[in-house]
Amino acid sequence: REDGMKYTNLAFPLTVPKDTGQVVGLEERGRPRMDGSGSYKGKAEGSNSSQGLWIASPAKTTLTEAKHIYWFESAYDAMAYYQLHQANDKDLRKAVFISTGGNPTVEQMRGVLTLSLPAKQHICFDTDLAGIEFAKNLQQEMYRVVRSTIEETPERKPYLDSVTDGKNLDEGDIDLLPDALRSSYGKYESAWEEAMSMRSSGLCHPDDIREQTDIMNGNYKEFREGLREFLGLDKANDASFVREQPTYPNKDWN
């Protein structure tokens, strides 16, 4: 710095999902301070923070080829996760790891999701209040991107209009669906109510509860397939996600 102070930081290149060959900034992380007060974290001056992310894959897998995408708030977290899990998951090297460098922006999320909807999205943000909010925002943006792939026809429009922005496609007004789909949803709903009743009663054997849960899940799968067919949604674009969290009491992965 101009005042003579020197710092040693790790720098992680930021790229835009549609052009990972062009570096648009740097995510910077410093060493932990000796007094335990934390460490420097930020982005290099001039970085494209609204669109740029750290995108990495040990096997050089591209976003469009990936079957698994792992989302983190920092590159440190992504590396820590890989070190913790790679010995027991040899395919992990084929995954793509993403760092948003903090609060994920709409442009960051949409840039990745539009190229990787068929992949399973692993949401690995921190477990503090900010991380919980980031996870919620990513889920909502995923639902928006899925919705954007559907052609709105006169037959589909009433139901699609009933789905609140940022919500799952199954959260619309079921009464606006064709008769067969309403019936299919009714089977799932009845199975769900039975499973919840069995769990809460304390009177049912775990094997019986598991059997009823399997029936419930099978009925939902049948309904979801029918919903996709009605909406003209390609199964590959019906994005899925899983929330992964570090072991308590750790709030992050490093």
Regions found by a protein language model. Give the residues of each.
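Short active-site oxyanion
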Residues: 65-69, 121
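TOPRIM fold recognition
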Residues: 85-254
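Glycine-/acidic-rich phosphate or pyrophosphate-binding loops and their flanking alpha/beta elements
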Residues: 38-66
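Cytosolic beta-strand hydrophobic patch enriched in CBS
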Residues: 11-14, 70, 98
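Helix N-cap/beta->alpha junction signal
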Residues: 73-74, 127
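Basic, glycine-enriched DNA-binding surface that flanks or lies within the catalytic cores of DNA
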Residues: 1-49
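Conserved Rossmann-like nucleotide-cofactor binding loop
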Residues: 77
